[in-house]
Amino acid sequence: MKFSENWLRSHVPIQATRDELSATLTAIGLEVEEVTPLGESLGQVVVARIVEAVRHPEADRLQVCSVDAGQGELMQIVCGAPNARAGLVAPLALVGAKIGELTITAAKLRGVASNGMLCSAKELGLDSDASGLFELPDDAPVGQALAEYLGLPDASIEIKLTPNRADCFSVRGIAFDVAAACASEVVAFDAVAVAPVSTRSLAVELDAGKDAPRYCGRVIEGIDPAAKTPVWLAERLRRSGVRPVSLLVDITQYVMLELGQPMHAFDLETLHGPIGVRRSRAGEQLALLDGRQVTLDDSFLTITDAGRAVALAGLMGGLDTRVTETTRNVFLESAYFDPAAIMGRGRKLGLHTDAGHRFERGVDPALPPQAIEVATRLVLELAGGTPGPVVHAQLPEHLPQPVHIRLRRARIARVLGIQIDDADVVRMLRALGMHVEAVAEGWEVMAPSRRFDIAIEEDLIEELARIHGYDRVPTTLPGGASRIAMPSETQLDELSVRRQLVARELQETINYAFVDAALLERWQLTEGLVPLANPLSAELAIMRPRLLPGLVATLGRNAARQAGRVRLFELGKVFAAAADTGAAPGESQHVAAAVCGDALALQWGEPARKVDFHDLKGDLMALAAASGAQLEFQPSTQPFGHPGRSADIYREGVCIGWIGQVHPRLAKALDIDVDVIAFELQLMPLVQRTLPRAGELSRFPSVRRDLAFLVPDEVSWAAVSASVRTTVGPLLREVQLFDRYVGQGVEPGFKSLAMGLILQDNSRTLTDRDVDAVVADVVAVIEREHRARIRS
């Protein structure tokens, strides 16, 4: 954004110097890229009129001009500019004037005396145009100092705007920020409505919904086509990087630069029906102002006249309806278009216009009525004419609504680390154009409609920091007590679980937390599932209810690639739908393992064999021993497990998992042709542990007695061992199952269980009588409670 320093100061009275203003702009986020001083050395440059211009007798490209500079007599100036002619008003540098590094002196050019220099805009440092003399209006006062006439000295300031600051694509928008930073106030803006004189108007129809919710238009008739752009307006445009074209076009450009509202002027006589705003039709063609004929798709917004497209909304007008030097009747347009409807459309056609640049970032939706009044007043003042009524079409339901934000004192202090006085908070926010009301904990703030970037409390805090000054926010290192949690001695951490399993020659794998619904159906896990609203694919549409489906699938892929021994484990979350509708799904941490193939790595010391249930159970018991968990196993009825080789896992009477061989039918459905042994447990019940207590070591010897019982097939070792522990009490150090036998010598429906009892007392040596009494009690209890008999 480029603008005139004097123009900005006309909107916000400040005492800051140019350097201070530049520093302030950069400090508040409007980074100054370039400052170009204008007219600081024009003390001896005056307005002059060429009375006569004749060809130089010795040079075809030079002219000898008689110039009236208000000095009382005509001055002779030799000039080589192609536009030098009688009647032209242009700047004249008198003898002694310093133009840049050049000091003007009286001289002879090809033998003809020259007592000054007629200047171009570039030579004066006012513009880049060096094609000819700087042409001034015919009514410019001859002899007046040029600096006084042009309102110099001044400076052209160019700032770099971030995409969120669309409100600063106008002089007035910048003025609000400067006023807030310099503790000043923006000059009140006069947007008094111009009363209509005629009744002529054009109806407006909005057919683009939210893309074009507001459109203002006005007819002005009887404009003087010969009216010229006044020098003050042309200079403000020129110093803002816009070259003056014609009065009507210059007025629309001026309003855009001052207020931030792009406008367009149509030649009324080229319009033949009501004005419409609609989406373009695929294949529709339009001749643009730059002379190009473009073919549109259906993504553009168009301004239409009796159905035909006459302009690209928010981008560029049409060639057929443009204003010309003969235009006497115009239709002024001022509208609000949704940024999303304009964004990227210009790039499709290779267009980059000031209007499009503003609309795609967001223009104040409240501006169109004000802008059309300002433009009307300028047209009437500078070119005359008869205004009609303003036609104001809008779709209120699609206009952006004001945002009310609660700003808390405590939040300001917490985010910025400093306290800002209440009075300063209110002053800064109001200077930025915000409506502020005090409430108990702070303020209720409503951002102005031009500030699309303010939506939450943190946006307001950022504004305060920006205006208050980032340099006034102290640099402090983060502080506070360490929040590193102390490791719990009553819980085995996940790293320890991983290390235990790795020590058992298991390898960790990490699978997706999403699984295929078809896979879960094969596992018969179809209840309490949590589907994803936006899955990555149909095969990853369900949050996993167990780890095993994904883990076994991974094991199968490895086994299918000639991996003879696969041992995998995984720690991860599983998910279940909540019982209450609308509640968040439940999640818990599980640990699972799956193995197949050889039980032992390739070696020569032991014969090769396949892994079985007891191998993986041994791995699980080693993990349980690390936490001191006493696990119990009961026959399982899980449909995915082998009916005779799987068990539910209990701790303290609560089922916490499953272990066993995957059902052969399921393995076959998964294209796995080897036996798969697996377990899965809830992690938290497994890793909870009781702190060990130191006990007295007995100084007396222990005694071992071996017993073998014939027990019914349905009686488990867990039940038998529990009876033994209850019966023997503190004398029992350990009970071990060392043999299980079914076959010859054992009647059908029974099995042989052989156990070893290790007994010890802390106070004395046990005698044979003591041991025999304990054994007799054990035999009696097992025979009575489990319908067993001692095996002879």
Swiss-Prot record:
Main location: cytoplasm
Needed co-factor(s): Mg(2+)
Segment forming the signal sequence: none
Name this polypeptide is given: Phenylalanine--tRNA ligase beta subunit
Domain B5 as annotated: residue spans: 400-475
GO cellular component, one term: phenylalanine-tRNA ligase complex
Matching InterPro entries: aa-tRNA-synth_II/BPL/LPL, B3/B4_tRNA-bd, DNA-bd_dom_put_sf, Fdx_antiC-bd, Fdx_antiC-bd_sf, NA-bd_OB-fold, Phe-tRNA-ligase_IIc_bsu, Phe-tRNA-ligase_IIc_bsu_bact
UniProt keyword annotation of ATP-binding present: yes
Catalytic activity: tRNA(Phe) + L-phenylalanine + ATP = L-phenylalanyl-tRNA(Phe) + AMP + diphosphate + H(+)
Subunit structure: Tetramer of two alpha and two beta subunits.
Lineage: Bacteria, Pseudomonadati, Pseudomonadota, Gammaproteobacteria, Lysobacterales
One example GO MF annotation: phenylalanine-tRNA ligase activity
Cellular compartments annotated: Cytoplasm
One GO BP annotation of this record: phenylalanyl-tRNA aminoacylation
Class of the enzyme per the UniProt entry, highest EC level: ligase
Gene3D superfamilies, per database record: 3.30.56.10, Bira Bifunctional Protein, Domain 2, Ferrodoxin-fold anticodon-binding domain, Nucleic acid-binding proteins, Phenylalanyl-trna Synthetase, Chain B, domain 3
Similarity-based family: Belongs to the phenylalanyl-tRNA synthetase beta subunit family. Type 1 subfamily.
Matches recorded under SMART domains: B3_4 (SM00873), B5 (SM00874), FDX-ACB (SM00896)
Annotated tRNA-binding domain residues: 39-147
E.C. designation(s): 6.1.1.20
Keyword Membrane among record annotations: no
Key words, A-Z: Aminoacyl-tRNA synthetase, ATP-binding, Cytoplasm, Ligase, Magnesium, Metal-binding, Nucleotide-binding, Protein biosynthesis, RNA-binding, tRNA-binding
Protein source organism: Xanthomonas axonopodis pv. citri (strain 306)
